[in-house]
Amino acid sequence: MTNIRKTHPLLKIINHALIDLPAPSNISAWWNFGSLLGMCLLIQILTGLFLAMHYTSDTMTAFSSVTHICRDVNYGWLIRYLHANGASMFFICLYMHVGRGIYYGSYTYLETWNIGIILLFAVMATAFMGYVLPWGQMSFWGATVITNLLSAIPYIGTTLVEWIWGGFSVDKATLTRFFAFHFILPFIITALVMIHLLFLHETGSNNPSGIPSDSDKIPFHPYYTTKDALGFFILFLLLLLLVLFSPDLLGDPDNYTPANPLSTPPHIKPEWYFLFAYAILRSIPNKLGGVLALVMSILVLAIIPFLHTSKQRSMTFRPISQALFWILVADLLTLTWIGGQPVEHPFITIGQVASILYFSIILILMPLASLIENKILKW
């Protein structure tokens, strides 16, 4: 008799995705981040669900409800910090996953790549709205500053901002709707993840060499289930280390002060994982220009597949492109640092140089380097 996992309508889907899936035999640890992101999403949904049971989305009680979770709810502090730091882990995995995609040319799977970009935007929107919910100083002012950016849109900007706010400033209506969106978006993200995987399984995984691996496949289980399990263990260990030893390491002390519309914090800045984009936004003195640069900093990923001029898919055997890639990584770290600094000399200039370099590497230098490498290899 045929195994039930191969015949049952539901188990068959799981079998084709996680058990009998033919996978390349040489995929490295860089291919672990997809499954790690799945784990992060699950942790966020579960901890978020338990937090939502005790949280109140009202300006008068939001801050104290978070305090109540940490002080009075059984293991509430653990759930809250797992959720907050889980978001940081989520973004670390996200950026590594995207970086892997750029390095190994995975972006040539256009549908998978584009769904991935939509996923990135959705996760960023979710994280931003989640940061507003504790209703601390940075929550309030972060929401005010970021939503205000939409007022740069010509003609409809101001109306749009007031429509999002549900009034003339960030207030009760804003907090309530942000909570509603923050709750629903992870489920939309889960649906998008399924589409992402659906498109990936149409083509199969890429591999470090960038060469088709149809002649050399191994079953996903037990090889990659074991490898993923090790990844889960390491990531969860790192998350627990962060949560149990230094839960506020990545947070902002200002968010322990209740939101006060009459007092502006000295430095308004988002969570660390948005600082690179924030630095790009601030590096342009014009409001609309800054907003466009901010959006383009992520949207530029959609252009990358069309700028692939190399005869090879992966960067494994392309030293010039490799050097540019790691300069890009260093540049993003520089932008992250600048985003957290005050707007003064020399940080303004460093931010502007780093922003120009960011777009130059992706849009100009990498395609040029690929052409040079083709010439070197006489292709």
Curated annotation (Swiss-Prot):
<keyword id="KW-0813">Transport</keyword>
<dbReference type="Pfam" id="PF00032">
    <property type="entry name" value="Cytochrom_B_C"/>
</dbReference>
<comment type="subunit">
    <text>The cytochrome bc1 complex contains 11 subunits: 3 respiratory subunits (MT-CYB, CYC1 and UQCRFS1), 2 core proteins (UQCRC1 and UQCRC2) and 6 low-molecular weight proteins (UQCRH/QCR6, UQCRB/QCR7, UQCRQ/QCR8, UQCR10/QCR9, UQCR11/QCR10 and a cleavage product of UQCRFS1). This cytochrome bc1 complex then forms a dimer.</text>
</comment>
<comment type="function">
    <text>Component of the ubiquinol-cytochrome c reductase complex (complex III or cytochrome b-c1 complex) that is part of the mitochondrial respiratory chain. The b-c1 complex mediates electron transfer from ubiquinol to cytochrome c. Contributes to the generation of a proton gradient across the mitochondrial membrane that is then used for ATP synthesis.</text>
</comment>
<comment type="similarity">
    <text>Belongs to the cytochrome b family.</text>
</comment>
<dbReference type="InterPro" id="IPR030689">
    <property type="entry name" value="Cytochrome_b"/>
</dbReference>
<feature type="transmembrane region" description="Helical">
    <location>
        <begin position="320"/>
        <end position="340"/>
    </location>
</feature>
<dbReference type="GO" id="GO:0008121">
    <property type="term" value="F:ubiquinol-cytochrome-c reductase activity"/>
</dbReference>
<keyword id="KW-0249">Electron transport</keyword>
<keyword id="KW-1133">Transmembrane helix</keyword>
<dbReference type="InterPro" id="IPR048259">
    <property type="entry name" value="Cytochrome_b_N_euk/bac"/>
</dbReference>
<feature type="binding site" description="axial binding residue">
    <location>
        <position position="182"/>
    </location>
    <ligand>
        <name>heme b b562</name>
    </ligand>
</feature>
<keyword id="KW-0830">Ubiquinone</keyword>
<dbReference type="Pfam" id="PF00033">
    <property type="entry name" value="Cytochrome_B"/>
</dbReference>
<keyword id="KW-0812">Transmembrane</keyword>
<dbReference type="GO" id="GO:0045275">
    <property type="term" value="C:respiratory chain complex III"/>
</dbReference>
<keyword id="KW-0349">Heme</keyword>
<keyword id="KW-0496">Mitochondrion</keyword>
<feature type="binding site" description="axial binding residue">
    <location>
        <position position="97"/>
    </location>
    <ligand>
        <name>heme b b566</name>
    </ligand>
</feature>
<feature type="binding site" description="axial binding residue">
    <location>
        <position position="196"/>
    </location>
    <ligand>
        <name>heme b b566</name>
    </ligand>
</feature>
<feature type="binding site" description="axial binding residue">
    <location>
        <position position="83"/>
    </location>
    <ligand>
        <name>heme b b562</name>
    </ligand>
</feature>
<dbReference type="GO" id="GO:0006122">
    <property type="term" value="P:mitochondrial electron transport, ubiquinol to cytochrome c"/>
</dbReference>
<dbReference type="InterPro" id="IPR027387">
    <property type="entry name" value="Cytb/b6-like_sf"/>
</dbReference>
<dbReference type="GO" id="GO:0005743">
    <property type="term" value="C:mitochondrial inner membrane"/>
</dbReference>
<feature type="binding site">
    <location>
        <position position="201"/>
    </location>
    <ligand>
        <name>a ubiquinone</name>
    </ligand>
</feature>
<dbReference type="InterPro" id="IPR005798">
    <property type="entry name" value="Cyt_b/b6_C"/>
</dbReference>
<feature type="transmembrane region" description="Helical">
    <location>
        <begin position="226"/>
        <end position="246"/>
    </location>
</feature>
<dbReference type="InterPro" id="IPR016174">
    <property type="entry name" value="Di-haem_cyt_TM"/>
</dbReference>
<feature type="transmembrane region" description="Helical">
    <location>
        <begin position="77"/>
        <end position="98"/>
    </location>
</feature>
<feature type="transmembrane region" description="Helical">
    <location>
        <begin position="347"/>
        <end position="367"/>
    </location>
</feature>
<feature type="transmembrane region" description="Helical">
    <location>
        <begin position="178"/>
        <end position="198"/>
    </location>
</feature>
<dbReference type="InterPro" id="IPR005797">
    <property type="entry name" value="Cyt_b/b6_N"/>
</dbReference>
<protein>
    <recommendedName>
        <fullName>Cytochrome b</fullName>
    </recommendedName>
</protein>
<dbReference type="GO" id="GO:0046872">
    <property type="term" value="F:metal ion binding"/>
</dbReference>
<keyword id="KW-0472">Membrane</keyword>
<keyword id="KW-0479">Metal-binding</keyword>
<feature type="transmembrane region" description="Helical">
    <location>
        <begin position="288"/>
        <end position="308"/>
    </location>
</feature>
<keyword id="KW-0999">Mitochondrion inner membrane</keyword>
<dbReference type="InterPro" id="IPR048260">
    <property type="entry name" value="Cytochrome_b_C_euk/bac"/>
</dbReference>
<feature type="transmembrane region" description="Helical">
    <location>
        <begin position="113"/>
        <end position="133"/>
    </location>
</feature>
<keyword id="KW-0679">Respiratory chain</keyword>
<feature type="transmembrane region" description="Helical">
    <location>
        <begin position="33"/>
        <end position="53"/>
    </location>
</feature>
